[in-house]
A protein has these predicted regions:
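Bacterial signal peptide processing site
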Residues: 8-10
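Mature extracytoplasmic domains of secretory-pathway proteins
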Residues: 55, 59-99
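Functional cores of ribonucleases/endoribonucleases
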Residues: 86-119
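A structural signal for short hydrophobic beta-strand segments in well-ordered beta-sheet cores
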Residues: 60, 120-122
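C-terminal motif of bacterial Sec signal peptides marking the signal peptidase cleavage site
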Residues: 3-6
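Post-signal peptide N-terminal segment of mature Sec-exported envelope proteins
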Residues: 16-35
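Extracytoplasmic/periplasm-facing segments of secreted or lipoprotein envelope proteins
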Residues: 32-71
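Short, low-complexity, Pro/Ser/Thr/Gly-rich segments in the mature regions of secreted, periplasmic
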Residues: 123-134
């Protein structure tokens, strides 16, 4: 004996599917994963900048990067002006993702204000940010 089933059989096949990721609660694993993604993006930005040799400080500038939970940047990063159109959108992407991460996971920070550097100096081929205290 055989049972024939047609294509019009109405059976709900979606009952055991996992929930959409956006409906899942934030847990420790997803926070660790997102932090790892942020770390990877930050490292790729720093790697892109470090490929460039610093020979003339006038060819370099700096930008705020990241976001503290209570406001302000996490740090400043020096970059060569010649890659500004490539690097600034990536720095902004990282900063926005850090802000979203901070809000999503209720991250707290030390709220210490990171002062902007006053200039960039080339030391042994590497760009160094100079602050008022130096």
């Amino acid at each position: 004996m055989f049972t024939l089933v047609s294509c019009n059989t109405s059976k709900n096949a979606n009952t055991n599917l996992p929930k959409d990721i956006s409906e899942r609660p934030a847990d420790e694993d997803s926070q660790k994963y997102e932090q790892a993604q942020l770390d990877k993006l930050k490292a790729s930005i720093q790697s892109e900048v470090s490929k460039e040799k610093c020979t003339a400080a006038s060819e370099w500038t700096f930008a705020p990067m990241g976001a503290k939970a209570c406001g302000g940047p996490q740090q400043y990063i020096a970059y060569p002006k010649k890659i500004e159109t490539i690097i600034l959108p990536r720095i902004e992407e990282y900063t926005q993702k850090v802000k979203a991460f901070n809000e999503k996971y209720n991250i707290t920070s030390d709220c210490m204000m990171v002062m902007p550097p006053t200039s960039v100096k080339c030391i042994n081929g590497k760009a160094q940010l100079i602050t008022a205290e130096q």
